[in-house]
């Protein structure tokens, strides 16, 4: 039998050890423009076609999905890590709220919803 060490529950247990989770980029429609946001806590949910990722209501991604009911998911290739990171660039300070970085990242529109994918990713949902 193995001796177990109890984990203190006063802080998130996931900060105490390494787990593997995919890097994804979530694409949403935001008013008259598009938003891209990298996420790393993403996973299939059960054996059916359900998928989940963690996002706080403080983020535009959450608000966009709540408003439109739609989002696209790109699983970037390992050599696209910098592109994924750039999609988290801050919004313009001119009050427009636009993320100009989205205009220069290699993207394409999805076939079925109004959102963007990252080109050359290995999986699109």
Indicate where each model-derived feature is located.
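Active-site-proximal mixed secondary-structure blocks
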Residues: 1-35, 44-50, 54-125
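Short Gly/aromatic-enriched secondary-structure transition segments
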Residues: 39-41
């Amino acid at each position: 039998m193995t001796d177990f060490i109890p984990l203190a529950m006063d802080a998130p247990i996931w900060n105490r050890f390494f787990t593997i989770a995919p890097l994804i980029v979530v694409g949403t429609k935001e008013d008259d423009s598009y938003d891209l946001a990298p996420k790393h806590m993403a996973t299939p949910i059960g054996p059916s076609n359900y998928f989940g990722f963690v996002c706080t209501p403080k983020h535009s991604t959450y608000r966009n999905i709540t408003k439109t009911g739609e989002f696209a998911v790109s699983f970037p290739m390992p050599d696209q890590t910098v592109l994924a990171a750039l999609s988290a660039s801050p919004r313009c300070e001119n009050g427009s709220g636009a993320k100009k970085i989205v205009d220069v990242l290699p993207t394409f529109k999805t076939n079925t919803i109004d959102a963007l994918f990252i080109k050359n990713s290995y999986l699109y949902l």
